[in-house]
Regions:
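Short beta-strand/loop segment that forms part of the nucleotide-sugar
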Residues: 41-51, 74-76
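Short, acidic, metal-binding catalytic loop of nucleotide-sugar glycosyltransferases
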Residues: 26-41
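Short beta-strand-to-loop acidic/aromatic patch adjacent to the donor-nucleotide binding site
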Residues: 109-120
């Protein structure tokens, strides 16, 4: 029987006040999916992206058991204020995300698990990641499959075996909340990027491109765990 290493995941959640007022409803579902995890060695880093009212953001900490959340409202020139065109949606949250990753790294978090504030993890998500890091200890980036409400299960090509498949993430073929990596070994941060046409592209797409280049340059390994463990409803 596989003996899981004592991996403590830092769960990165960045949230902001949606214009439709639905942040508390969606975030509650996201948090409930964390609380339902069968793997219990985790702590949430909950970052507000210039979240106002601050009292609403502060109330979210009460949803967690004691010692299971660290919360900080980050005021770092949020993209939704900086950009007035489509870039605010494509680049939204990058400044706060990077501040949160820096915070986690300073706290000594070795494994980061990404969870967007409107996504839901299946109860076995962290267990799947922990199993993968234990069975394949050279893996520096582990991700799972996820279901998008309108696009179906991603990635589309899932014909892989349980081994070091070294399958890198495809920019438009994975859900952001499926990703995890060794924060202690990978110093990358999100940035504003563009397609070859010069059009701006989503921040996580640029991150996966940078991740593939970094991993290739440093001869590091990916692992794709072929289980569907994340849901995104596309709202």
């Amino acid at each position: 029987m596989l003996k899981i290493n004592n991996i403590r995941f830092g769960i990165r959640i960045v949230t902001y006040p949606r214009s439709d007022g639905n942040t508390p409803i969606l975030l509650r579902k996201t948090v409930d999916s964390v609380l339902s995890q069968s793997y219990g060695n985790w702590i949430v880093y909950l970052a507000g992206d210039a979240y106002e009212p601050a009292s609403e953001f502060n109330s979210y900490s009460s949803w967690f058991p004691q010692g299971k959340v660290r919360a900080r409202n980050i005021f770092a020139d949020p993209e939704r204020h900086k950009f007035k065109d489509q870039r605010w949606r494509l680049y939204g949250g990058i400044s706060a995300i990077n501040k949160c990753l820096d915070w986690m790294h300073a706290d000594g978090i070795s494994h980061v698990a990404i969870l967007d504030h409107d996504d839901i993890w299946n109860h076995n998500h962290l267990k799947t990641l922990a199993d993968a890091y234990t069975q394949f200890p050279e893996a520096q980036f582990v991700y799972t499959a996820g279901r998008h409400a309108s696009m179906g299960v991603l990635p589309k090509n899932r014909d892989v075996q349980v081994r070091y498949n070294n399958l890198p993430p495809m920019e438009e073929d994975m859900l952001h909340s499926c990703a995890s990596w060794r924060l202690d070994n990978i110093p990358l941060r999100y940035r504003y990027g563009c397609r070859s046409s010069g059009e701006p592209q989503c921040g996580d797409m640029t991150m996966w491109q940078d991740m593939k280049s970094f991993m290739r340059e440093h001869n590091l390994r990916f692992y794709f765990a072929n289980k569907e463990t994340v849901f995104h409803d596309g709202m």
